[in-house]
From Swiss-Prot:
Protein name in the entry: NAD kinase 1
Thylakoid keyword on record: no
A GO cellular-component term linked to this record: cytoplasm
Cofactor: a divalent metal cation
Active site: D45
Superkingdom of this protein's organism: Bacteria
Family, per entry: Belongs to the NAD kinase family.
PANTHER family named among the record's database cross-references: NAD KINASE (PTHR20275:SF0)
EC number: 2.7.1.23
GO molecular function terms attached to this record: ATP binding; metal ion binding; NAD binding; NAD+ kinase activity
GO biological process: NAD metabolic process; NADP biosynthetic process
Length: 265
């Protein structure tokens, strides 16, 4: 089996990554940064996001597992003290692969140039680079509303505990194939109205934004931030691809939610 390790880059993470590499090589595994079967992330959820975007083009062949060296992560489920146990599990234990839904983002342009396509594991956001975002919102090909405000956040179920939650969105279990649209400071008065509530769209339902012409847009996809010009539309939907995680033991989603947001530290 081929593996690679991605580290957060701090001293403790690099030390753990080096130790795991030596252990796995001793077990006869092959280090392969180009076409790994397993990607081990050592750091936090941010490190795993970087790993996902590094290998997004081979999601059917690659599975991820995380060791968190910082705060409790939603994706990184092993502690630094459990590194030897994890290595033995990888080497000797049949593992389960769990799949989570992803968000597909397609940006089309006024001048007809080639569209830009992205996959998000957590969320994608859109804001105006100059001020208030004004955009038509279409759902399933029909006009829904005209949004005016700071921006919109479109998240995956596994990303619903991140920026989406801070915006008042719902937490969605990652077994549900859906995306969620949450508003950022929408303008609502006697003249301008939005639905004013997060929207959950099931698989095969598509959301298309059609921003005001000439507006420069600041678009994020997970940790990536870009400015796009002459945007005709932005399409969001549940992606056909899924991200795959290696599981050697139960990792209950609702327990992670409770430990992160409710339980006493």
């Amino acid at each position: 089996m081929k593996f690679t390790i991605m580290s957060k880059g701090d001293q403790s993470s690099d030390t753990l990554a080096s130790t795991m590499k030596e252990y796995l090589l001793d077990f006869g595994f092959i280090m392969d940064e180009q076409e790994p079967d397993i990607v081990i992330s050592v750091g936090g959820d941010g490190t795993l996001l970087y790993a996902f975007h590094r290998y997004y083009n081979r999601l059917d062949e690659t599975a991820f597992v995380g060791v968190h060296t910082g705060h409790l992560g939603f994706y990184a489920d092993w502690l630094p003290t459990e590194v030897e146990k994890l290595v033995i599990a990888i080497a000797k234990t049949p593992f389960q692969v769990v799949e989570y839904p992803l968000l597909e983002v397609i940006i089309r342009y006024m001048n007809g140039s080639k569209e830009s396509q992205y996959l998000a594991m957590n969320e994608a956001t859109v804001k105006s680079a100059e001020g208030t975002l004004v955009t038509e919102v279409e759902i399933r090909g029909e006009y829904f509303e005209t949004f005016r405000g700071d921006g919109l956040c479109i998240s995956t179920p596994s990303g619903s505990t991140a920026y989406n939650k801070a915006l008042g969105g719902a937490i969605i279990h990652p077994s549900i194939e859906a995306i969620q649209i949450a508003e950022m400071a929408s303008i609502n008065n006697r003249v301008f109205r939005t639905v004013g509530s997060p929207l959950v769209l099931p698989k095969h339902h598509t959301c298309v934004l059609k921003p005001t012409a000439g507006m420069n847009l600041q678009i994020t996809v997970d940790h990536l931030t870009m400015v796009h010009q002459d945007v005709k539309s932005i399409q969001y939907r549940v992606a056909n691809e899924k991200v795959r995680f290696v599981r050697f033991r139960p990792f209950p989603f609702w327990k992670r939610v409770r430990d992160s947001f409710v339980a006493d530290k």
